[in-house]
Amino acid sequence: MPDWSDVPLLYQAQIEGRCQLQRQENKQKSPAYDWVDQWTKFYHSADDSGGKSPQPDNSNQWRRNLSPVNRNNSPEPPQFSEEAKTRPYTMTWRLVTNGGQDDGIIRPAMGARGYPYYPGSSMKGAFRRACTTEQALKYCGKPSQGDQGSEPGILRFLGGYPTDNNWTRNLVDIAHPQQEKQVIQDGKTNANVLLSFHEVTLNFGISSTISLDEQEWRTIWQIWEKAIGNGLGSRVSAGYGRFKDVPSPETLLQVHLKGQGITATLLDKTSEFRPNMFKAALRGHTLRLLGGMTDEKTAKHLTQILWGGIDGAATLGQLGISFTYHDDDLKFGEHPYTPPGKSEQIMPLYNLKRGTLQISCMNRRTSPEERQELAELAKAIVQFSLLLGGFGKSWRRADHWQFFRPYLEKGNKPMIGCHWKFIDSSESLYLPITDLQQDLSRFIDRLRTQFHNYAAKQGYTIHPDNPVHCDWREAWYPYDNQGGVQVWGRIVEDRIKAIAWFHQPYEGTHTLRNLQGSIGRDSQTGRLWHRIYPYYHSNSEGKLQRQKPPIELLTFFPEPTEDSAHFIAFLNERSDFVKIW
């Protein structure tokens, strides 16, 4: 009788004792990696090219028959016939498609000889959505209606195939929802495994049933680029499914950024710069602000309308993001440290010299007036994000390498914090400050009013001063001795002060230990954010001028404890911080 362990994991049941791709115990290697290794080992090249095959070109050699019979058992990617027109496009990051062939895991569809591909049917759907009505009828055909049969269009969509075997790299991805932990309350969260293409070049093929001239083919490819500009596959609003040098036709806002911090890691501890962290931050701040103005159900629903989600029925949000950068502008590093009594640890770091965050309208039918309102709201949320925090891991804390290096010099402390900046034309997004308290409090009040107006457009009546609010750790409403938030700030005339308070008593024997959060097995999210923000004046011509001292900002979500009460009294009576909000 055959041994069940000889059966490839691909064909084993997702039950205990067989193949549980979503289960990882005692820091062991996830079964997903063995699953992927069994699938992809045949496709790795034996040469020194790292699995690469020649890139496609427009020659007839590339357009050979896509025939698994002729080239069975070949590790070379499938190729199109001579009649097909093809173009390669490279992903900016990852692409998620669900073949729907496995229980409990999302993975790409598999075609001839086990190659993953982007299905022609999905390609046709994306193309049709980018067409005018006339173009859709001509190219894609007329679907059947009642007694009337369907009429085929002139185009045949052949799908998209990897141009080389680099698709086998970095397939294991994770979806790690943390909204509950980040905003509402601490709790255990699980990272779910999925398989997605990572920075793969796909060659897309289209053929026609009739002869077309070059001008018409240019029109067809323009429509296709409009389609992929909106993103392909799933999770496009979080930065998946985007392609290099193909801008979104629905872009509302472009923000140029630079930043440094701690790199995210996958299940196997591989570090990866993950652009979905931008949407996570913007969505999280939306939920915080709405949570301070209305009840939980309404706050979550309005957040889902704006950014999308799967709470209840899956919803395509009004806004989505993509993030692009040149490879030369992103550098990775390491921070080694040895905690007392333990072995050396390595923390992966990133330093991004320049990148562009694009925020797009996800609904093409949105009116020009509503687009403008969404653009203004998105701009304000981005400004709020960089005013009080950052993006990615450790976003609540100021970058210690830049602002508190002595803490790291002994080599026994982990890296903490991040630091993000507006650059180039986006420097205009910095808030000009004449009066620290008035200018920043007005900005926060104005943003809350924008959310009030947004909610009204969705049919909800809320008000910034509404006494109804969510009982969350980080719901954004004025502190009332039970919950809420306070923002404190100071212009740094001498030195940055608060960064040291997280590591030593800030007054006498009083520390922030119970307020700053912790990492490890029993991690807790801190109630304090600390940000070093550039100080800009607006001159007589309305142009921003950078001032030498920065601004130090503390955002505090107090709880009804003695630690919180003492720290508030200290800030108010015995520090040079002023209460901003």
Model-assigned labels for residue ranges:
Residues M1-W581:
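Basic, Gly/Ser/Thr-rich N-terminal segments that form RNA-phosphate-binding interfaces in CRISPR RAMP
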